[in-house]
């Protein structure tokens, strides 16, 4: 029996990782540790909440004593750390919360893992601390080819209809960090703490940096679910600047599969990039979402294009992110399983079929946040 804590397991990516591990490894005890902030939602895990190898614990990762006690009581062998404040816009409004959760929370987990595992006869043997991070820590890449060029790589996640790169360079694991937002600065700091605990104390750590995820259960402050929800209600679609910023997109279940593989087979002290070689300008992906929603709702194609509303750009908005995940593919054999067009179709269908979930998470405080972010821009 392995006893694994997954932090942030009620969130978007975390819930997919929890579900995968609970269903795939019935001999593991999966402990979902989540504070249940605005983006944490136990409804994301209704389908596995009664499984015998699953337990939910409501706890703040900054609670060192609580985490240490839980590790001792549950004889925890591994930690998969996803809990984080992750929305760049919120980090600009409230950087203190991001520093507290992403930096001090990670430090609390590291210190608890070190203290508990060092107390055991076997110490760190058979243990693992896996920290999930973001491609945003690398900074921004130049968009040297705004018209798009043929990319050097293709994966199963790459778009079949729109497979372009917007520059020659990609994020690789050996790049120096250059975070530009409070969010990415906090994640970069937490990454450094994880590596420092390996280098100083020998803690068996792994770090991964992933590109933008999309799929079911994502809180609708993020681009794709935000726009699906707004199109559904025929509300304006706020697009930063000219919509030219580029991101690499990966279906969330493929990210969860990568986490599973790296947790079990990745090398201690290594960093792995996870991405789909699937670059899209924001404005282009928005148009794909509009066409998909309109088609599935029986509206004329492009009927809601007039909802696109250009607003003042985000402060410090990085122009281009593009991940090179060649190392992960060559060393561990991972590659995405779902092509972009299929993933978008599944994603839009899920949100349209789960309107009660959307309505529940977009009530109350969400509307206040939305008005604060996008009114008068």
Residue locations for each model-derived region?
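C-terminal substrate-binding subdomain of Rossmann-fold SDR/epimerase-dehydratase oxidoreductases
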Residues: 4, 17, 30, 40, ...
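N-terminal Rossmann-like NAD(P)+-binding domain of SDR-like oxidoreductases, especially those catalyzing
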Residues: 1-213, 253, 263, 282, ...
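Conserved GTPase G-domain signal focused on the G5
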Residues: 217
């Amino acid at each position: 029996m392995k006893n694994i804590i997954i932090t942030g397991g009620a969130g978007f990516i975390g819930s997919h990782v929890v579900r995968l591990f609970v269903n795939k490894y019935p001999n593991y005890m999966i402990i979902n540790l989540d504070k249940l902030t605005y983006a944490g939602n136990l409804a994301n895990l209704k389908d596995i909440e009664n499984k015998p190898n699953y337990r939910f614990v409501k706890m703040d990762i900054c609670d060192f004593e609580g985490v240490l006690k839980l590790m001792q009581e549950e004889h925890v062998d591994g930690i998969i750390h996803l809990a984080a404040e992750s929305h760049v816009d919120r980090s600009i409004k409230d950087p203190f919360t991001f520093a507290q959760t992403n930096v001090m929370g990670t430090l609390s987990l590291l210190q608890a893992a070190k203290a508990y595992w060092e107390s055991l006869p076997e110490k760190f043997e058979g243990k693992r601390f896996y920290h999930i991070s973001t491609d945003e820590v690398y900074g921004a890449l130049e968009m040297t080819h705004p018209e798009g060029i043929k990319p050097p790589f293709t994966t199963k996640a790459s778009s079949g209809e729109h497979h372009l790169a917007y520059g020659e360079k990609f994020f690789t694991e050996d790049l120096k960090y250059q975070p530009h937002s409070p969010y990415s600065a906090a994640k970069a700091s937490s990454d450094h703490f994880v590596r420092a605990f390996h280098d100083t104390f020998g803690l068996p750590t792994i770090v991964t940096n992933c590109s933008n995820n999309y799929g079911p259960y994502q809180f609708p402050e993020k681009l794709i679910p935000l726009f699906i929800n707004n199109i559904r209600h025929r509300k304006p679609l706020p697009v930063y600047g000219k919509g030219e910023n580029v991101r690499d997109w990966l279906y969330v279940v493929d990210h969860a599969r990568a986490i599973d593989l790296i947790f079990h087979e990745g090398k201690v002290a290594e960093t792995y990039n996870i991405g789909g070689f699937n670059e899209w300008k924001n404005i282009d992906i928005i148009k794909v979402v509009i066409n998909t929603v309109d088609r599935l709702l029986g509206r004329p194609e492009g009927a809601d294009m007039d909802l696109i509303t250009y607003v003042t750009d985000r402060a410090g908005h990085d122009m281009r992110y593009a991940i090179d995940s060649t190392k992960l593919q060559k060393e561990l054999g991972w590659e995405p399983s779902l092509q972009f067009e299929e993933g978008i179709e599944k994603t839009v269908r899920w949100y349209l079929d789960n309107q009660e979930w959307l309505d529940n998470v977009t009530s109350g405080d969400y509307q206040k946040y939305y008005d604060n972010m996008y009114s008068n821009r």
